[in-house]
Amino acid sequence: MTSIAGDVDRAGLAALEPQVRAALASAHSDVSRWADEPGSGAQIDKAMLHLQEARGALRLAGLAGAAHYIGAIAALVAALKKGEVPPQPLVLALLDRAGTTLSRYLMRVIRGEADVPLRLWPTYKVLRLTA
């Protein structure tokens, strides 16, 4: 899943990064609102749409590994929606940490560091184990 540094469209990523960050923040906000009222599926559905938007933007920029990472975030949100994972504060904190981890990773890639998705592994692993 690693890409060669030249495969990443850094200018495109720099342009898309605010959109990705905003989509992640909106998804987290929607999940938090849903956790306050779990009966309303509209909020969590909106969160899934925001995650799809962010995932697509990362694919456009050539970051397949980061897009896959968002898939793990989406899997946890889907597990919340299905009731497979309870909306506990620790789970919501994990979603927040996952978004922050990805945002920091993207900024490092924009600044010229190699796209090495393995850097996302520690949080990715926790996301997958939780979902």
Task: Locate each region found by the language model.
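A structural signal for well-ordered alpha-helices, especially hydrophobic packing surfaces
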Residues: 21-24, 28-31, 35, 55-58, ...
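Long, amphipathic alpha-helical coiled-coil segments characteristic
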Residues: 5-49
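DHp/HisKA dimerization-phosphoacceptor four-helix bundle of two-component histidine kinases
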Residues: 15, 22, 49, 56, ...
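Structural secondary-structure packing elements that flank or coincide with functional cores
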Residues: 1-10, 84-131
